[in-house]
């Protein structure tokens, strides 16, 4: 079957080629015999790409000069639909989504954003076909295996929100490994929302508060918005400033219902 690659993939390939070329340009002039024609051709090839890179960096610098969000959350959906529209298996879309995480973490880190929450897998997602669920779990394990050392090197802190005890053993162990390895990092904190549902999170918090009231650890009058917030998975993390849904749907899908009361939606 002939696959019509979409422009996002083509652009990504161009970016990779450009980065490689820019990194090896000095080596290029050292190891190759000097030929003016080669030099001119290579310089002409690099000029527009250097300008693009400079433009992107200027945009980042411009954003950093203004107030930026402390906490961005992303509902990572639409991957399956993206693949189906191109005649590809849904797994190809999920793989593209996982690959995009690297770039998302990089840009948030460069901008100085302190918290990034990614909605990777909801409690409702277990209802999807078994093969699709297995693919998503395998991709997460693959990503953490491949990227963990680099994330740690770049001072990224990995945390989770959701009931990870119900995850397949290999996924649970890989997540625990990532959390433990990056525990003391001080860069951007990436919260992976996996087996997460906001309603069940609120129920969990209410039960814990009720237990404390029943055991006299808390007085009824002490219950306020902050106390409830502190008993959520996100306790101690500021509420999101911005929520992005990549698939384009205008719904919250049981994500951070308590925390996004004043969040900008995009």
Cite the ranges covered by each PLM segment:
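Extracellular/periplasmic metallocenter environments
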Residues: 16
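Flexible, compositionally biased loop and terminal segments
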Residues: 26-266
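Accessible peptide chain termini
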Residues: 1-2, 40
């Amino acid at each position: 079957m002939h696959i019509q690659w979409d422009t996002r993939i083509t652009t990504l390939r161009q970016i990779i080629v450009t980065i490689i070329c820019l990194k090896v340009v000095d080596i290029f002039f050292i190891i190759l015999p000097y030929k003016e024609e080669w030099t001119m051709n290579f310089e002409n090839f690099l000029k527009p790409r250097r300008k693009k890179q400079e433009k992107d960096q200027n945009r980042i610098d411009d954003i950093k000069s203004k107030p930026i969000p402390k906490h961005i959350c992303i509902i990572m959906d639409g991957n399956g639909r993206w693949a189906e529209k191109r005649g590809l298996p849904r797994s190809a879309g999920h793989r593209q989504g996982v690959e995009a995480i690297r770039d998302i973490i990089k840009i948030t880190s460069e901008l100085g954003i302190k918290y990034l929450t990614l909605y990777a897998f909801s409690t409702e997602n277990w209802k999807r076909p078994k093969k699709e669920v297995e693919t998503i779990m395998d991709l997460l394990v693959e990503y953490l295996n491949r990227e963990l050392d680099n994330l740690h090197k770049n001072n990224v802190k990995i945390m989770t929100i959701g009931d990870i005890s119900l995850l397949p053993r290999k996924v649970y162990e890989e997540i625990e490994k990532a959390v433990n390895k990056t525990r003391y990092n001080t860069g951007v904190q990436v919260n992976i929302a996996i087996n997460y549902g906001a309603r069940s999170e609120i129920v969990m918090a209410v039960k814990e508060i009720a237990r404390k009231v029943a055991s006299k650890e808390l007085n009824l009058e002490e219950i306020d918005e902050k106390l409830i917030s502190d008993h959520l998975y996100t306790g101690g993390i500021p509420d999101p400033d911005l929520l992005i849904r990549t698939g384009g749907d205008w719904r919250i899908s049981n994500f951070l219902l308590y925390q996004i009361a004043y969040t900008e939606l995009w």
